[in-house]
């Protein structure tokens, strides 16, 4: 009788751990936030059209609200005036959350090495995957989504990852100085 029950158990139940189930659900249903700032946003929008179909990768609907999103795709040039807004939106997103930096401008400032442009979004939010190109093709964004899904698949549920970038005092003062200069030269 006990061997019969044992065989029934093995045939009808799947044993797994919680991390595998949670990570499968997280990577299969990413909810990206629309945060397009420049040219890369056009390619990000094109990725959701029928020709490219981002829904195949589990990132079907771009959300307009940070409280409904778990993936921020920063696509375009981040200016110093936009940086606090981006940080506030990042803070409003629920955990776990991820960030993809799409394009040269959001990754390293692009060709704009000026006082008004943030030289990399990773100075204010932690970036999980960088997408190269100016602007990158939708296929590059899909590759980044696959890399992010691989990263999510290896996460543990109980260990929290850092969701904040800590700036040392000199970087913080330099950042504030750049904001002051931008505000003086461009009063709003």
From Swiss-Prot:
GO terms for cellular component: plasma membrane; respiratory chain complex I. Its EC number is 7.1.1.-. [4Fe-4S] cluster binds at residues 39-40, 105, 134. GO terms for biological process: aerobic respiration; electron transport coupled proton transport. It holds the Pfam family Oxidored_q6. It catalyses: a quinone + NADH + 5 H(+)(in) = a quinol + NAD(+) + 4 H(+)(out). GO terms for molecular function: 4 iron, 4 sulfur cluster binding; iron ion binding; NADH dehydrogenase (ubiquinone) activity; NADH:ubiquinone reductase (non-electrogenic) activity; quinone binding. Transmembrane segments: none annotated. Its main location: membrane. It is a peripheral membrane protein. It is found in: Cell inner membrane. It is an enzyme of class 7 (translocase). NDH-1 shuttles electrons from NADH, via FMN and iron-sulfur (Fe-S) centers, to quinones in the respiratory chain. The immediate electron acceptor for the enzyme in this species is believed to be ubiquinone. Couples the redox reaction to proton translocation (for every two electrons transferred, four hydrogen ions are translocated across the cytoplasmic membrane), and thus conserves the redox energy in a proton gradient. PANTHER family: NADH DEHYDROGENASE, NADH DEHYDROGENASE [UBIQUINONE] IRON-SULFUR PROTEIN 7, MITOCHONDRIAL. Belongs to the complex I 20 kDa subunit family. This is NADH-quinone oxidoreductase subunit B 1. The gene is nuoB1.
């Amino acid at each position: 009788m006990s061997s019969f029950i044992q065989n029934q158990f093995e045939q009808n139940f799947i044993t797994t751990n919680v991390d595998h189930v949670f990570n499968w659900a997280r990577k299969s249903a990413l909810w990206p936030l629309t945060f397009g700032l420049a040219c890369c946003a056009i390619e990000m929008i094109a990725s959701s059209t029928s020709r490219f179909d981002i829904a195949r990768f589990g990132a079907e609907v771009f959300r307009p609200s940070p409280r409904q999103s778990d993936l921020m795709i920063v696509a375009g040039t981040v200016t110093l005036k936009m940086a606090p807004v981006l940080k506030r939106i990042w803070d409003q997103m629920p955990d776990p959350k991820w960030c993809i930096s799409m394009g040269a401008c959001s990754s390293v400032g692009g060709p704009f090495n000026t006082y008004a442009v943030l030289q990399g979004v990773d100075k204010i939010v932690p970036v999980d995957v960088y997408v190269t190109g100016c602007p990158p093709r939708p296929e590059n964004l899909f590759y980044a989504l696959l890399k992010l899904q691989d990263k999510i698949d290896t996460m543990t549920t109980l260990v929290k990852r850092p969701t904040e970038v800590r700036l040392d005092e000199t970087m913080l003062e330099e950042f504030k100085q750049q904001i002051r200069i931008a505000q003086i030269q461009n009063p709003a």
